[in-house]
């Protein structure tokens, strides 16, 4: 059981009425709270919840409609996303109770101040290195417009400006990260055909690839609903076509790909987690056509080349700078 869920269950009497759990983990919490429903934006966790609790959790960027007496936000890493979640739920709960739960190392003490916009926050519990806060919604806001919260910026590239649209919670929100900046400079001579942007975030890599190789088919994949929505907005802002899918890792990707480009993720909430990246390297060959290429950027300290060579083929370093390296390998 996730420690945040354990803290909630210490106060389970507060959640005996219909309660919405925003960002809930894929554990036994829904079994323990029979009137609760989930709101998830993580495709992998949603799949697990669907398998165990059919119809009791929704995958979306917007809060599900329901007659909730209370709502709980599991504190995300992004402050902007936390603001959006709290405002979305406070708008649905005039006079109701809004809870915030999170790990101390994830910043719950600081984040609890975000509740003050809706009433007087109270700390209800502290256990398992987590805290539970509550506020009665005295000042219900208007429901936030997610698109109005998007950050838009332009990248001046050699073949023209690229427009990027980033929603709260997306990696490197509102700016280009250093790893992607390096990879953007080394996307020449990709094989033509079906191309995949794995862990697409706001869709920067995929949009450039589609513009540079317009005859190629493009798929973008991310585990996060806000990233999927951002990538669709980025493609639309540049007048580009592409399929954007939500999936938990490379196992959800198409097969027969000509190339995979990626700045692979290595965070899950506040925790470092290389599982999705390592699985990409281990399984890329299963999704690439013969002669297909994997081209990715990663922190220089990560020992990816031996893993790539073990599972795909000879690995070359195309570029290095600012603490990152661009690697390439082809399926035989």
Swiss-Prot record:
Keyword set, alphabetical order: Cytoplasm, Methyltransferase, rRNA processing, S-adenosyl-L-methionine, Transferase
UniProt keyword annotation of Cytoplasm present: yes
Pfam families (UniProt xref): MTS, MTS_N
Compartments reported by the entry: Cytoplasm
Quaternary structure annotation from Swiss-Prot or TrEMBL: Monomer.
GO cellular component, one term: cytoplasm
Gene Ontology MF terms: 16S rRNA (guanine(1207)-N(2))-methyltransferase activity; nucleic acid binding
Stored InterPro entries: DNA_methylase_N6_adenine_CS (IPR002052), Mtase_sm_N (IPR013675), rRNA_ssu_MeTfrase_C (IPR023543), RsmC/RlmG (IPR046977), SAM-dependent_MTases_sf (IPR029063), Small_mtfrase_dom (IPR007848)
Protein name: Ribosomal RNA small subunit methyltransferase C
Enzyme class: transferase
Gene: rsmC
Family: Belongs to the methyltransferase superfamily. RsmC family.
EC number: 2.1.1.172
Catalytic activity entry: guanosine(1207) in 16S rRNA + S-adenosyl-L-methionine = N(2)-methylguanosine(1207) in 16S rRNA + S-adenosyl-L-homocysteine + H(+)
Purpose of the protein: Specifically methylates the guanine in position 1207 of 16S rRNA in the 30S particle.
């Amino acid at each position: 059981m996730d420690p945040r869920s354990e803290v909630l269950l210490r106060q389970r009497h507060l959640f005996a009425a219909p309660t919405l759990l925003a960002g809930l983990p894929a554990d036994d919490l829904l079994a323990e709270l029979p009137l609760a429903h989930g709101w998830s934006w993580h495709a992998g966790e949603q799949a697990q919840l669907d398998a165990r609790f059919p119809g009791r959790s929704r995958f979306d960027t917007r809060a599900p409609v329901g007659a909730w007496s209370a709502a709980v936000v599991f504190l995300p890493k992004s402050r902007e996303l936390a603001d959006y979640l709290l405002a979305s739920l406070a708008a649905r709960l005039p006079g109701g109770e809004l809870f915030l739960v999170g790990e101390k190392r994830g910043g719950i003490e600081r984040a609890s101040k975000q509740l003050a916009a809706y009433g007087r926050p109270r700390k209800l519990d502290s256990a398992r290195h987590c805290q539970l806060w509550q506020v009665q919604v005295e000042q219900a806001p208007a429901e936030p417009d997610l698109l109005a919260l998007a950050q838009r910026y332009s990248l001046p590239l050699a073949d023209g400006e690229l427009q990027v649209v980033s929603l709260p919670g997306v990696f490197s929100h509102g700016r280009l990260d250093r790893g992607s900046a390096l990879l953007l400079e080394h996307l020449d001579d990709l094989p033509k055909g079906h191309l995949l942007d794995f862990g697409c975030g706001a869709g920067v890599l995929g949009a450039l690839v589609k513009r540079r190789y317009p005859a190629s088919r493009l798929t973008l994949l991310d585990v996060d609903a806000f990233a999927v929505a951002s990538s669709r907005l980025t493609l639309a802002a540049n007048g580009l076509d592409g399929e954007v899918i939500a999936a938990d890792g490379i196992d959800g990707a198409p097969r027969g790909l000509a190339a995979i480009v990626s700045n692979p993720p290595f965070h899950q909430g506040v925790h470092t987690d290389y599982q999705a990246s390592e699985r990409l390297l281990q399984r890329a060959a299963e999704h690439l056509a013969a002669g297909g290429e994997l081209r990715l950027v990663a922190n220089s300290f990560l020992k990816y080349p031996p893993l790539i060579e073990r599972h795909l083929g000879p690995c070359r370093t195309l570029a290095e700078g600012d603490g990152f390296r661009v690697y390439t390998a082809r399926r035989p």
